[in-house]
Amino acid sequence: MTILLTGGIGSGKSSVRRILERMGVPCYDADSAVKGFYGVPLKSESEHLASGTTEKPFLLPEIEAALGLSFRKIDGSFDSRKLADAIFSDSGRLKTVESIVFPALATDFARCRKTVGQTVPGAVSSAVERPAGATPLADLAIFESATALDKPDFPKLWDKCIWVDAPEDLRVERVIARDHCSREQVLSRIRLQPPLEAHRSEVDAVILNDCSLQDLPMRVRSALSSTIPIRIKP
């Protein structure tokens, strides 16, 4: 079983994912995986693990050929700003890039699922018990993506969905601290993302991430145990 972990910018999805990883639940971060597709070096071992594998298809040449544009810096490395400027101002270009990236994500995720025991440490955790007839932990994985629910062409890779939410002011505060941008810039990004209400019928559980990191694991366990038939040890 695969659970989609999603939510708006600044909601704290990555914090929830790291808690799930510590519990031994295999997790896949689609955003980190896509960086690998563009040839961006991942910053840490945890980012390598979250993206599933370091062996990513290099999609940048295919994207450049499809759009007839170059997205490289002078040194030949990927220029994310050039790509963003090109696709977010042209829906046709965006759809072209998505038609290349989305199938690659599905294939990469499937490959990672097959090797989950080697890819994610602690894939069998003492924090999770499996009652009779419940989902085996080895068959459970988290697919983290901020945009999967918003994209009609995104492959339906998940069986259940957990949404991470937080009050808007807290989300703004987190993103300003992380990205060193202005309040107005953060609010404009938030406005571009559909809220929870737009996807309520597709969401199986909500984690309200407005608490301390010490209290958050309890909320994560509660959401996970209400979504699938596994019993979480206190």
List PLM regions with ranges:
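ATP-binding Walker
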Residues: S11
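Small-molecule kinase domains that catalyze NTP-dependent phosphoryl transfer to phosphate-bearing small molecules
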Residues: F109, D150-K151, P155-K156, A177-I228, ...
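Short beta-strand-centered segment that lines the nucleotide-binding/catalytic pocket of NTP-utilizing
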Residues: V25-G39
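Hydrophobic anchor at the beta1->P-loop junction of P-loop NTPases
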Residues: L5
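ATP-dependent NMP and nucleoside kinases share a basic, alpha-helical "lid"
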Residues: A110-R113, P136-R174
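Walker A/P-loop
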Residues: S14
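ATP-dependent small-molecule kinase phosphotransfer cores
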Residues: G36-V120, P136-L137
